[in-house]
Protein backbone atom coordinates (compact mmCIF):
# COMPACT_ATOMS: atom_id res chain seq x y z
CA UNK A 1 0.00 0.00 0.00
CA UNK A 2 1.45 3.38 -1.06
CA UNK A 3 1.41 6.32 1.38
CA UNK A 4 0.15 9.43 -0.37
CA UNK A 5 0.05 13.11 0.54
CA UNK A 6 -2.14 15.23 -1.70
CA UNK A 7 -0.62 18.69 -2.21
CA UNK A 8 -3.29 21.22 -3.14
CA UNK A 9 -3.44 24.97 -3.55
CA UNK A 10 -4.17 27.55 -6.22
CA UNK A 11 -1.97 27.85 -9.34
CA UNK A 12 1.27 29.56 -8.27
CA UNK A 13 0.93 28.73 -4.57
CA UNK A 14 4.31 26.98 -4.58
CA UNK A 15 3.27 23.33 -4.93
CA UNK A 16 6.14 22.39 -7.25
CA UNK A 17 8.75 24.31 -5.27
CA UNK A 18 7.72 22.85 -1.90
CA UNK A 19 7.35 19.33 -3.32
CA UNK A 20 10.90 19.50 -4.71
CA UNK A 21 12.22 20.38 -1.22
CA UNK A 22 10.18 17.60 0.43
CA UNK A 23 11.45 15.08 -2.13
CA UNK A 24 15.03 16.22 -1.60
CA UNK A 25 14.88 16.09 2.21
CA UNK A 26 12.19 13.60 3.29
CA UNK A 27 12.40 10.70 0.81
CA UNK A 28 8.95 11.22 -0.69
CA UNK A 29 8.59 10.99 -4.47
CA UNK A 30 6.97 14.02 -6.08
CA UNK A 31 4.32 13.16 -8.66
CA UNK A 32 2.85 16.21 -10.34
CA UNK A 33 -0.41 15.30 -12.04
CA UNK A 34 0.14 18.26 -14.38
CA UNK A 35 3.71 17.22 -15.26
CA UNK A 36 2.60 13.63 -15.91
CA UNK A 37 -0.18 14.89 -18.17
CA UNK A 38 2.13 17.30 -20.02
CA UNK A 39 4.69 14.49 -20.53
CA UNK A 40 1.95 12.15 -21.80
CA UNK A 41 0.74 14.88 -24.16
CA UNK A 42 4.28 15.11 -25.65
CA UNK A 43 4.89 11.36 -25.74
CA UNK A 44 5.20 9.97 -29.26
CA UNK A 45 2.19 7.80 -30.09
CA UNK A 46 0.15 8.77 -27.01
CA UNK A 47 -3.50 7.85 -27.45
CA UNK A 48 -4.44 10.66 -25.04
CA UNK A 49 -2.17 13.45 -26.34
CA UNK A 50 -4.71 15.50 -28.32
CA UNK A 51 -7.37 15.13 -25.63
CA UNK A 52 -4.96 16.26 -22.90
CA UNK A 53 -3.82 19.20 -25.06
CA UNK A 54 -7.37 20.45 -25.55
CA UNK A 55 -8.13 20.26 -21.80
CA UNK A 56 -4.89 22.07 -20.89
CA UNK A 57 -5.54 24.85 -23.43
CA UNK A 58 -9.10 25.34 -22.15
CA UNK A 59 -8.03 25.29 -18.50
CA UNK A 60 -10.42 22.38 -17.93
CA UNK A 61 -9.80 19.14 -16.06
CA UNK A 62 -8.56 16.00 -17.86
CA UNK A 63 -10.73 12.86 -17.43
CA UNK A 64 -9.89 11.16 -14.12
CA UNK A 65 -9.21 7.71 -15.58
CA UNK A 66 -6.27 9.10 -17.57
CA UNK A 67 -4.77 10.95 -14.60
CA UNK A 68 -5.23 8.02 -12.17
CA UNK A 69 -3.61 5.59 -14.63
CA UNK A 70 -0.60 7.88 -15.06
CA UNK A 71 -0.28 8.31 -11.26
CA UNK A 72 -0.66 4.58 -10.59
CA UNK A 73 1.98 3.69 -13.23
CA UNK A 74 4.38 6.27 -11.78
CA UNK A 75 3.92 4.85 -8.26
CA UNK A 76 4.55 1.31 -9.47
CA UNK A 77 7.72 2.48 -11.24
CA UNK A 78 9.25 3.65 -7.93
CA UNK A 79 7.59 1.44 -5.38
CA UNK A 80 10.23 1.59 -2.62
CA UNK A 81 9.58 5.24 -1.76
CA UNK A 82 8.57 6.28 1.76
CA UNK A 83 5.54 7.92 0.19
CA UNK A 84 4.29 9.97 -2.72
CA UNK A 85 3.45 13.64 -2.98
CA UNK A 86 0.60 13.93 -5.44
CA UNK A 87 0.60 17.54 -6.51
CA UNK A 88 -2.43 19.17 -8.15
CA UNK A 89 -4.81 16.22 -7.73
CA UNK A 90 -7.65 15.58 -6.97
CA UNK A 91 -8.94 18.79 -8.51
CA UNK A 92 -12.69 18.14 -8.36
CA UNK A 93 -15.36 15.76 -7.07
CA UNK A 94 -15.03 13.53 -10.15
CA UNK A 95 -11.25 13.23 -9.54
CA UNK A 96 -11.86 12.30 -5.92
CA UNK A 97 -14.44 9.63 -6.77
CA UNK A 98 -12.23 8.26 -9.56
CA UNK A 99 -9.24 8.10 -7.19
CA UNK A 100 -11.29 6.32 -4.51
CA UNK A 101 -12.55 3.81 -7.07
CA UNK A 102 -9.25 3.15 -8.88
CA UNK A 103 -6.81 3.39 -5.97
CA UNK A 104 -8.86 1.74 -3.20
CA UNK A 105 -6.58 -0.76 -1.44
CA UNK A 106 -3.53 0.52 -3.39
CA UNK A 107 -2.91 3.89 -1.72
CA UNK A 108 -3.53 5.45 1.68
CA UNK A 109 -3.95 9.23 1.94
CA UNK A 110 -1.89 10.28 4.99
CA UNK A 111 -3.05 13.91 4.83
CA UNK A 112 -3.67 16.83 2.48
CA UNK A 113 -1.05 19.59 2.43
CA UNK A 114 -2.98 22.75 1.54
CA UNK A 115 -0.74 25.63 0.43
CA UNK A 116 -2.94 28.69 0.84
CA UNK A 117 -1.92 31.90 -0.90
CA UNK A 118 -3.74 35.09 -2.02
CA UNK A 119 -4.77 34.87 -5.69
CA UNK A 120 -3.03 38.15 -6.60
CA UNK A 121 0.33 36.73 -5.44
CA UNK A 122 -0.34 33.41 -7.22
CA UNK A 123 -1.05 35.11 -10.56
CA UNK A 124 2.01 37.35 -10.23
CA UNK A 125 4.20 34.30 -9.49
CA UNK A 126 2.85 32.36 -12.49
CA UNK A 127 3.41 35.27 -14.88
CA UNK A 128 6.97 35.72 -13.58
CA UNK A 129 8.10 32.12 -13.20
CA UNK A 130 9.27 31.65 -16.78
CA UNK A 131 8.59 27.91 -17.00
CA UNK A 132 7.44 28.33 -20.60
CA UNK A 133 4.11 26.65 -19.87
CA UNK A 134 1.49 27.26 -22.54
CA UNK A 135 -1.07 27.97 -19.81
CA UNK A 136 0.99 30.59 -17.91
CA UNK A 137 -0.71 33.54 -19.57
CA UNK A 138 -3.22 35.88 -17.96
CA UNK A 139 -6.28 34.51 -19.77
CA UNK A 140 -5.53 30.84 -18.98
CA UNK A 141 -4.55 31.76 -15.42
CA UNK A 142 -7.88 33.45 -14.76
CA UNK A 143 -9.66 30.31 -16.01
CA UNK A 144 -7.40 28.09 -13.88
CA UNK A 145 -8.06 30.17 -10.75
CA UNK A 146 -11.81 30.11 -11.46
CA UNK A 147 -11.68 26.32 -11.92
CA UNK A 148 -9.70 26.03 -8.67
CA UNK A 149 -12.22 28.17 -6.74
CA UNK A 150 -15.28 26.35 -8.10
CA UNK A 151 -14.00 22.77 -8.16
CA UNK A 152 -10.81 22.23 -6.14
CA UNK A 153 -11.54 24.30 -3.05
CA UNK A 154 -14.63 22.16 -2.22
CA UNK A 155 -12.32 19.09 -2.27
CA UNK A 156 -10.12 20.73 0.37
CA UNK A 157 -13.27 21.40 2.42
CA UNK A 158 -14.24 17.71 1.99
CA UNK A 159 -10.88 16.55 3.41
CA UNK A 160 -11.14 19.17 6.17
CA UNK A 161 -14.29 17.44 7.46
CA UNK A 162 -12.23 14.23 7.76
CA UNK A 163 -9.51 16.06 9.71
CA UNK A 164 -6.92 15.41 6.98
CA UNK A 165 -6.03 18.98 5.93
CA UNK A 166 -2.78 20.60 7.07
CA UNK A 167 -2.80 24.24 5.92
CA UNK A 168 0.42 26.17 5.41
CA UNK A 169 0.35 29.82 4.27
CA UNK A 170 2.62 29.89 1.24
CA UNK A 171 2.88 33.61 0.42
CA UNK A 172 5.92 33.80 2.73
CA UNK A 173 9.57 33.12 1.73
CA UNK A 174 10.21 29.53 0.60
CA UNK A 175 12.46 28.60 3.55
CA UNK A 176 9.85 29.79 6.07
CA UNK A 177 7.08 27.89 4.27
CA UNK A 178 9.23 24.76 4.03
CA UNK A 179 10.10 24.87 7.76
CA UNK A 180 6.36 24.77 8.54
CA UNK A 181 5.81 22.00 6.00
CA UNK A 182 8.58 19.92 7.57
CA UNK A 183 6.85 20.25 10.98
CA UNK A 184 3.63 18.94 9.41
CA UNK A 185 5.48 15.87 8.04
CA UNK A 186 7.29 15.29 11.36
CA UNK A 187 3.96 15.31 13.22
CA UNK A 188 2.33 12.98 10.67
CA UNK A 189 5.21 10.49 10.73
CA UNK A 190 5.18 10.29 14.55
CA UNK A 191 1.66 8.85 14.51
UniProtKB/Swiss-Prot annotation:
Disruption phenotype: In contrast to its homolog C29F7.3, does not confer resistance to 5-fluorouracil.
Domain of life assignment: Eukaryota
Molecular function terms from GO: (d)CMP kinase activity; ATP binding; CMP kinase activity; dCMP kinase activity; UMP kinase activity
Tissue: Expressed in neurons and the pharynx.
InterPro entries: Adenylat/UMP-CMP_kin, Adenylat_kinase_CS, P-loop_NTPase, UMP_CMP_kinase
Keyword Calcium among UniProt keywords: no
Catalytic activity line of the entry: CMP + ATP = CDP + ADP; dCMP + ATP = dCDP + ADP; UMP + ATP = UDP + ADP
GO biological process: 'de novo' pyrimidine nucleobase biosynthetic process; CDP biosynthetic process; UDP biosynthetic process
Residue segments, region LID: 128-136
Alphabetized SUPFAM superfamilies for the sequence: P-loop containing nucleoside triphosphate hydrolases
Region (NMP): 32-62
Chief site of localization: cytoplasm
EC code(s) of this entry: 2.7.4.14
Cofactors required: Mg(2+)
Binding site for a ribonucleoside 5'-phosphate: 38, 60-62, 88-91, 133, 144
Cellular component annotations (GO), alphabetically ordered: cytoplasm; nucleus
Location(s), subcellular: Cytoplasm; Nucleus
A Pfam family matched in the record: ADK
Co-factor binding details: Binds 1 Mg(2+) ion per monomer.
Keywords, ordered alphabetically: ATP-binding, Cytoplasm, Kinase, Nucleotide-binding, Nucleus, Pyrimidine biosynthesis, Transferase
UniProt remark on domains: Consists of three domains, a large central CORE domain and two small peripheral domains, NMPbind and LID, which undergo movements during catalysis. The LID domain closes over the site of phosphoryl transfer upon ATP binding. Assembling and disassembling the active center during each catalytic cycle provides an effective means to prevent ATP hydrolysis.
Sequence similarity: Belongs to the adenylate kinase family. UMP-CMP kinase subfamily.
Record's function text: Catalyzes the phosphorylation of pyrimidine nucleoside monophosphates at the expense of ATP. Plays an important role in de novo pyrimidine nucleotide biosynthesis. Has preference for UMP and CMP as phosphate acceptors.
Assembly with partners or alone: Monomer.
Name of the protein in question: UMP-CMP kinase 2
Species in which this protein is naturally found: Caenorhabditis elegans
Amino acid sequence: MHNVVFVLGPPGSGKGTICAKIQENLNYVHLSAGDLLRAERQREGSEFGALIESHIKNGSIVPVEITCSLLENAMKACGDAKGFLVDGFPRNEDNLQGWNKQMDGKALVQFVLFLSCPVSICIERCLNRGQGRTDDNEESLKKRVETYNQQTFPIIEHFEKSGLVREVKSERPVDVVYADVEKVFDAANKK
